[in-house]
Amino acid sequence: MAAKDKFAQRKNAGAIGGMMRTRVKERTKKMSSKTRRNYIRACNAFDVWRKGQGLSNKAVAKAPSKCVKQWQDALTEAGYSPSTIHTYIAGVCCGLGISMAGMTRAGTSADKRKSLGKSARAEKALERPENAEVVRFQRMVGGRRAALQRLKGGDLVRDESGEWCIQFLRDKGGKDQLQRIAPENLTAVQSYFKDKGPDELIFPQPIDKNLDLHGLRAEHARAEYERYAAICSTPKGRATMRAQLWRRFKNPRLGCKAWLTAKAKGDRAGMRRAERAFANEMADGQYHLQRANRATAELRGRPVSYDRLALCCVSVFALSHWRNEVTVKHYLL
């Protein structure tokens, strides 16, 4: 910690949250506004957490590194991805004026790293007999690495529309999510949960780090698009899927975060904004790729337009994303 740092010299640091935000603003003048906002958001989150833990201003000032490590452990336990934790820790370390040394990532997020694609390691990993069950399951479900590793026997459930799903607790961002199972895959998926206790891990052994799970998740997303496009090819099918999407949108635990937050605050205008945005995602018509995405699709022989409603079904029910743009760019291209 810098010797001239006023914060470090104080025995009682006062309002740590405010001081952290002030320091971030001073030290990020040459950084992008997005980085500054992320750092300030991280400081706010840390301040809320430490108050909930009963950590006083003085306790944090006396042992800032120890407190940040405790918060890092709490974020990991909550299911945040390594890259998200890294961003949070960077902001708080900046705010507290301490080094990030010793606070390295606990691994690499499968969804943030570059896909291994057709590399030799990935091909060999797919062919290994010991990986066969994970690969087969991933092609039917399309989960994230950390979520698959935590999957338990009690995580095969039905959603608000009565459809069978895999429940991923504390998935990306610490959120609980449901991903639907295609009817033709239900029996095979159920076999993984047979004779498993509610708290027994489905995959107790560490999943091979060379397995391109993101690539398999993308393969699953493309298969699900074809399935939902067939369902949405009739007026009855479109009406059914829209009704189910709205039910998920308003689910008290798994629904749209923006809408649920606005509802909790009694913000009717915010609720309407979220509803309009979601209605636009599943509007009739085609989602046409533009510029770089279109060029990439043409290069890879992929479609350059998608049915918006079917695409929204993939985003929400197969990937738990909510945004068609993310689904197309990261999974369908």
Sequence positions of predicted segments:
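Basic, Lys/Arg- and aromatic-enriched nucleic-acid-binding interface segment
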Residues: 117-145, 275, 298-299, 306-309
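Acidic, serine/threonine- and proline-enriched intrinsically disordered linkers and terminal tails
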Residues: 233-302
